[in-house]
Amino acid sequence: HDALPIWDERYNYASLPLSAGPENGTGLSCYFAMPFEKGARIEIENQSDRNIDAFYFYVDYLEMAKLPKDMGRFHAWYNHNLTEALPEGETEWGVTGAQKPNTTGERNYVFMETQGKGHFVGINYYVHCPTPMWYGEGDDMWFIDGEKVPSLIGTGTEDFFNTAWCPKEAFSHPYFGYPRVNNDIGWLGRTHVYRFFIEDPIFFEKSLKGTIEHGSNNNLTLDLST
């Protein structure tokens, strides 16, 4: 949960389940429960071109005679895409013409896709915006248990992350935050936001596909990672 390697930067942030602490975001902590029944293996991979002189770790675990039958397992899903704007070009807030609605979720950025039973507990969303244009009008859309039409549709990216009015202020809350905001003109540059569904998980019985538009009706080119 450090800044993505493609950014090659570190910074502090604090949330209830995850944190990156001093110094300069190098103290990484995770408080998600990760049940296992037969065994568990934790690996650390150096994906940089630099040697690691020292690595400190600490793991807490609890031994039980038997896990409850309904105990789930913890899963994380990574995705990274350079999205494509509409053929007619980029626009936002209808500046260069009327914007059509997106009713199917086609061409949305996918941040979660899985089969089986479970509940969604959170997302780290990294956006590298190549222009000063506001990146956050894309709606989140959730396809639960094989839905063709999403039953949950949001009202904008910043709304999905519990904020409003195009924020550019660093902020951390136990369940949502903007630990890294762009420092260039408009919204040009890198922004990291998160939201954790601890009190309001999204449940599914058969499958879940979580998506979000990149701009209204997917009209922006954005470098997105989750």
Positions of the model-derived regions?
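Beta-strand-centric surfaces of beta-sandwich/beta-rich domains
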Residues: 1-226
